[in-house]
A protein has these predicted regions:
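Compact, glycine-rich, soluble single-domain proteins
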Residues: 2-79
């Protein structure tokens, strides 16, 4: 899926990923390709992103929103 991580400073990450693991205000979730559309608030956490090449990336999240849209598009918006 195509993931964008956007902060007040601009685009922090943009690329193709296999999975995204985040902590929402309702609990921890992992999103894979072809996930159903979703919008949820994020809790303070470390987002774990696995890129298509297998590289694991970690992003510190204080708060924000996670959106999974149609067509394997996902965005994390952080403040």
């Amino acid at each position: 899926m195509k993931l964008n991580i956007i902060s007040l400073k601009g685009i922090e990450f943009e690329g193709d990923v296999v999975s995204v693991n985040v902590k929402t205000t309702s609990g921890e979730i992992t999103v894979l390709d072809n996930h159903r559309p979703l919008i949820t608030a994020l809790a303070k956490c470390q987002a774990v992103v696995i890129k298509k090449d297998g590289e694991k990336l970690n992003f510190n999240i204080e708060s924000g929103f996670f959106e999974v849209g149609e067509g394997n598009q996902a965005s994390i918006l952080v403040g």
